[in-house]
Regions:
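Hydrophobic cores of alpha-helical transmembrane segments in multi-pass integral membrane proteins
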Residues: 1, 12-33, 45-70, 87-113, ...
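Long, amphipathic alpha-helical stalk/connector segments used for oligomerization, subunit docking
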Residues: 185-187, 191
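Flexible, glycine/threonine-enriched loop-and-boundary segments that flank and lead into catalytic domains
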Residues: 217-226
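Surface-exposed loop and adjacent secondary-structure segments within mature catalytic domains
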Residues: 6-9, 73-78
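Juxtamembrane membrane-water interface segments that cap and precede transmembrane helices
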Residues: 76-88, 222, 309-310
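Surface-exposed, interaction-prone regions used to assemble/regulate multi-protein complexes
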Residues: 259-260
Length: 322
């Protein structure tokens, strides 16, 4: 029993429960903001607010359905319209749940750990407004070479390319905040987590716009390259910045000077970094191999490789993933 929608598979009763939970979350967050004792709202909270509002909008619109039983419903949309709304949701669920929320963490916890303010507050504000203005309209690049109108695909590609600028602006802002603390990379594994997270964020937000270009997408679409791209963001960026932030937060919550063992954090860092790099690299190589084999043709126009041959070629990379 699923809705058949990627990232939104849950049926309508659970969708309603998610809505209730999200409203409660929003009340707690915005209620806390309303009770603040200072007039200024730090930019990290702007990212959290955008994440909460946008996810609510995406969830409600994409989950609109006609129930036919307690465990089954059908989307209110059909055809290419349904596909476009689904990938407007899917793209922005990643963009706001796995990007905006964790940018808020980055803008708070990196300055806390290095003991200095964010490099450029003005740049962080520009980053925020540019990101939320552009990101919403790039979802059509998930549907290149489909029944979606070509102008919609091209417009989504254009917005995707524009996204490179604010994304890298935020990444550079985070890296420059660490400037002057590079000597601590040798002794502070928490800062290492944050540096690696920013590196993956920069890499992923370069790769995303590049893959939205139609000629590149013709090779990458439906392959493991796309999976590798998503995981470079989910494991490399989201995972690393979350771990680093937790290591900053936990001692403060429990009123301790620091974490129990810096050596264990250091071990955690190297295991996580090496594991993520191997995992993602195997997907990239596997995906490019798939794309090249699927596109290869003989002089008479027939396919050079069967689909089964392309699957067999990816076995070594799948073993690396395991």
């Amino acid at each position: 029993y699923t809705s058949t929608k990627e990232y939104a598979e849950l049926e309508w009763p659970i969708d309603l429960l998610i809505t209730v939970v999200w409203v409660a979350y929003a009340v707690v967050f915005f209620g806390t903001i309303a009770k603040r004792t200072t007039s200024h709202i730090y930019v990290a909270n702007w990212f959290f607010a955008a994440f909460i509002i946008t996810i609510a909008l995406l969830h409600i619109i994409n989950s609109m359905a006609v129930p036919v039983s307690l465990f089954k419903s059908y989307s209110m949309y059909s055809g290419a319209t349904d596909a476009m709304i689904q990938w407007w949701y899917g793209h922005n669920a990643v963009g706001f749940f796995l990007t905006a929320a964790f940018l808020g963490m980055m803008y708070y916890f990196i300055p806390v750990q290095v003991g200095r303010p964010v490099y450029s507050y003005r740049l962080s504000v520009v980053h925020f407004w540019a990101l939320i203005s552009v990101y919403m309209w790039a979802g059509g690049h998930h549907l290149h070479y489909t029944a979606l109108p070509d102008w919609t695909q091209s417009l989504a590609m254009a917005f995707s390319l524009v996204l490179f600028a604010p994304s890298w602006g935020g990444m550079i802002n985070g890296v420059m905040t660490l400037s002057g603390s590079w000597d601590r990379l040798r002794t502070d594994p928490i800062i290492r987590f944050m540096v690696v997270a920013l590196s993956f964020y920069g890499m992923s937000t370069f790769e995303g716009p590049m893959m939205s270009i139609k000629t590149v997408n013709a090779l990458s679409h439906y392959t493991d390259w796309t999976v590798g791209h998503v995981h470079s963001g989910a494991l490399g960026w989201v995972g690393m910045i979350t771990i680093g932030s937790m290591y900053v937060l936990i001692p403060r919550v429990f009123e301790r000077e620091r974490m129990y063992s810096i050596s264990l954090i250091n071990l955690h860092f190297w295991l996580a970094t090496i594991g993520v790099v191997i995992y993602i690299a195997s997907l990239w190589i596997s995906g490019i191999t798939q794309g090249l084999m699927w596109r290869a043709v003989n002089v008479d126009g027939t396919l050079t490789y069967t689909f089964v041959e392309s699957v067999k070629a990816t076995y070594p990379f799948y073993m690396i993933r395991v």
